[in-house]
């Protein structure tokens, strides 16, 4: 069973952190299969690193529950099951609903301007049918909400959820057919901010996460 940690991708990160993000992605995308034995030398060659950062990354992956160490046999891939992803979505929904409630109550004028600008970019790139840009902007929209909640631990948890969940069927979620639907879901969330209604924000976020789960998990 996947064990959640606060590890997230960081731009310009140290080698071990960047390596960890790459290995997480390879496991979650199925490049490294559940049950597969990890051969350290092969991974050192694959990622262009020495054994020290590789072992640091493996220890963190073990803490996350993505790999397991078996005495006298080495590391093996566990990965994440469909059920693990579904469970994570349930947790994410609860935390996102709390985050948006607090964010609407606590958002600053500057953060509100950033949220409005981000939503306008979502409208623009939906019109352009640019799925890659929407992937980035969607994450940014939610990140502003996390920061506006003024709860550092909640922000770290939700940022980490995003870093894992984005690997679950991203090609389905960001098909052109879904872009207008995504936009309208975020429009409802944004309207709750402009109306100053935490209740509407919680409801809009619940609908959005439920639909996101359906799109990703089926």
Question: What is each model feature region?
Answer:
Residues 20, 24, 96, 138, ...:
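Hydrophobic face of alpha-helices
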Residues 1-101, 105, 147, 217-218:
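Short linear motifs at protein or domain termini
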Residues 75, 83, 101, 120, ...:
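Positions in alpha-helical segments
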Residues 2, 11-15, 116-123, 128, ...:
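C-terminal all-alpha effector/ligand-binding and dimerization domain
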């Amino acid at each position: 069973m996947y064990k959640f940690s606060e590890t997230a991708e960081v731009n310009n990160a140290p080698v071990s952190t960047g390596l960890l993000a790459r290995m997480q992605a390879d496991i979650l995308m199925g490049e490294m299969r559940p049950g597969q034995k990890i051969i350290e030398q092969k991974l050192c060659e694959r990622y262009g690193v020495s054994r020290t950062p590789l072992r640091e990354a493996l220890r963190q992956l073990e803490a996350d529950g993505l790999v397991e160490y078996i005495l006298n046999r080495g590391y093996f891939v566990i990965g994440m099951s469909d059920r693990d992803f579904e469970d994570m979505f349930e947790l994410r929904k609860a935390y996102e609903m709390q985050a948006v409630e607090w964010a609407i109550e606590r958002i600053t004028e500057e953060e509100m301007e950033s949220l409005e600008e981000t939503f306008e970019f979502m409208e623009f790139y939906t019109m352009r049918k640019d799925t890659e840009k929407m992937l980035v902007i969607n994450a940014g929209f939610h990140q502003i909400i996390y920061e506006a909640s003024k709860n550092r631990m909640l922000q770290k948890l939700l940022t980490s959820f995003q870093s894992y969940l984005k690997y679950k069927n991203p090609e389905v979620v960001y098909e052109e057919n879904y872009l207008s639907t995504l936009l309208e879901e975020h429009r409802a969330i944004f309207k709750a901010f402009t109306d100053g209604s935490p209740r509407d924000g919680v409801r809009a976020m619940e609908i959005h996460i439920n639909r996101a789960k359906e799109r990703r998990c089926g």
